[in-house]
């Protein structure tokens, strides 16, 4: 590989970043995968697989490991950031002075900025300026299934149509990975944050033992909360019926590969928040997302009762069963109402 002709540099060598890098390389593209821990990258290079997260999925020959950030960012104009949302801004500020003049940035991070609840597009603009093309990919994607080449579909939105077209061509694989373009940059970002919150609630419901009826009701009303918040932010309501909305929501709420769902199940079974996080052993994005989504909802005056009750459990010590009963005991309403 020539030092400057990779199709993509992926920032973040966790399970999802590695899975996306594998997918790109499997499509025949030269891909550079960077991680912050040189020892981890050396292990990946030695094993030619990510044994910790994605065992038995060998790296294609066109996937190149890199621990030097300068070299990684020089390799491609296209940068795919796949890091937890609470370090997203920090990572962008770190890479900005090292990026090529023609750089374009896409992220697969799902969530909002820690503490402020800002959309990641606002974090990116603040860190990188107004000129760089931005894009986001989001949808129902478990890393293990994606890396294994099982059929998967996502949504892609960008501030730049040329960048969107290029990304769709790079990522799309007719055999296993379908990429839908979507002009709704706000909606595609927001769905990935709110679904994490609702997935914790779905897990709580199942952990309590409320059954499939309750889980489905919670998913449906969670989608309504997502759509209301999206409308307040200027998103297209139709986006939330697509991959980045309903698709990701159903996946995360119903399958135990979801850390957010498993976390919620433990809470529903009576485990405390700290112990549940420790037992998961990886980042539970929904824990922070709950606080961030609640902040955003308050800022825009959007009522989100499910989000509020999950917040009460996570941050105020409320019992999960009590929170569920609070939701069930709310006043009768028209299903189509805005609250």
Swiss-Prot record:
Known EC number: 1.1.1.94
Major subcellular site: cytoplasm
A GO term from the CC aspect: cytosol
Keywords: Cytoplasm, Lipid biosynthesis, Lipid metabolism, NAD, NADP, Nucleotide-binding, Oxidoreductase, Phospholipid biosynthesis, Phospholipid metabolism
UniProt GO molecular function: glycerol-3-phosphate dehydrogenase [NAD(P)+] activity; NAD binding
Gene3D superfamilies referenced in this protein's UniProt entry, alphabetically: N-(1-d-carboxylethyl)-l-norvaline Dehydrogenase, domain 2, NAD(P)-binding Rossmann-like Domain
Pathway: Membrane lipid metabolism; glycerophospholipid metabolism
Location in the cell: Cytoplasm
PROSITE patterns named in the record: NAD_G3PDH
Reactions it catalyzes: sn-glycerol 3-phosphate + NAD(+) = dihydroxyacetone phosphate + NADH + H(+); sn-glycerol 3-phosphate + NADP(+) = dihydroxyacetone phosphate + NADPH + H(+)
Xref: InterPro entries: 6-PGluconate_DH-like_C_sf, 6PGD_dom2, G3P_DH_NAD-dep, G3P_DH_NAD-dep_C, G3P_DH_NAD-dep_N, NAD(P)-bd_dom_sf
Residues binding NADPH: 15-16, 36, 110, 143, 259, 283, 285
UniProt enzyme class: oxidoreductase
GO biological process, one term: glycerol-3-phosphate biosynthetic process
Active-site residues, as the UniProt record annotates them: 195 (proton acceptor)
Binding-site residues for sn-glycerol 3-phosphate, renumbered to this chain: 110, 139, 141, 195, 248, 258-260
Domain of life: Bacteria
Family indicated by similarity: Belongs to the NAD-dependent glycerol-3-phosphate dehydrogenase family.
HAMAP family reported for this sequence: NAD_Glyc3P_dehydrog
Role description: Catalyzes the reduction of the glycolytic intermediate dihydroxyacetone phosphate (DHAP) to sn-glycerol 3-phosphate (G3P), the key precursor for phospholipid synthesis.
Protein name (record): Glycerol-3-phosphate dehydrogenase [NAD(P)+]
Gene, per the UniProt record: gpsA
